[in-house]
Amino acid sequence: MDEDKLKYKLKLISKYLAEGKKLHAIQILNNLIDESGTEELYFQLAELYESMGFVDSGKKILLDKIELNPEVDDPKLFLGQYLLRNSQWFEAIEVLNSISNSTPSSLFLIAYSYMMLKEFELAKEYFNKFIIHSGDNELKHEANFYLAKIEYELNHFDSALEYAKNAQYIYSDFWELNLVLAKVYYSLEMYTHAITPIKRALQLNPKEASIKEYAGRIYFKLEDFNKAENYLSEFIEMSSEVSAEIYTLLAKSFLKQRKKEEAKLFFELALNIDPEYKPAANGKEELQ
């Protein structure tokens, strides 16, 4: 196709998209693909279908491109990312595995897919493969962050701490990494060490309920019962579901401050959720 004609049609597509005329843009893109078949046009059309909610149509466009050029990796990588965005984890893994030897970034995406499927051991394997084959880039530090989360879920707290510290090189100002660090220190009973990351997480994202929960847990262990009360109360206000454990922890925070009526109320709330929860039953009994 003549270059000037191609530029004109691409400008026309941009104009239609700006005006919200997506069907017009799709028609022109389909015609351009028939005439030139360039990779970027397939990608643009797939993303346009995706933006309209036609995920399967976008996937078909990308599969058509792969069928035309099965030896080329880029369309497969793009399809893998596309499937990932749309939570089609198993299909993403299948596509990306076909290029894992030639495209290191696919290892990261496979690992992420396994993590979302809660296949943590497989996720670890692929994240570690990615780290070995990647340079010192931001994605490597992101892999360390995810490995910290995975190791925490597997109760491997020492290795979770190591990965979290590695991720700090770039992600020190990311609230979730600070929360992971605080949770790991809490699980290792290193409560004083947990203070700095939980404070940082609170500063970075004061509206995140899970940060309030762990702030309450940490301050309770440090016997700062007033702060424990405040953060646990905030967590309860922000949450639609609260466990008997959290109600009991708040009740104990009140009890340590000799606020017996408040303690009784929250022990009872805990027992309403789980009548067999012994810490709440024992706490209420102590008030008799």
Report each predicted region and the residues it spans.
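Helix-start (N-cap) detector for alpha-helical repeat units in TPR-like alpha-solenoids
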Residues: 6, 39-40, 73-74, 103-107, ...
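Canonical tetratricopeptide repeat
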Residues: 11, 44, 78, 109-112, ...
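Register position in tetratricopeptide repeats
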Residues: 18-19, 51, 85-86, 116, ...
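Structural marker of alpha-solenoid helical repeat scaffolds
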Residues: 34-35, 68, 98-102, 133-136, ...
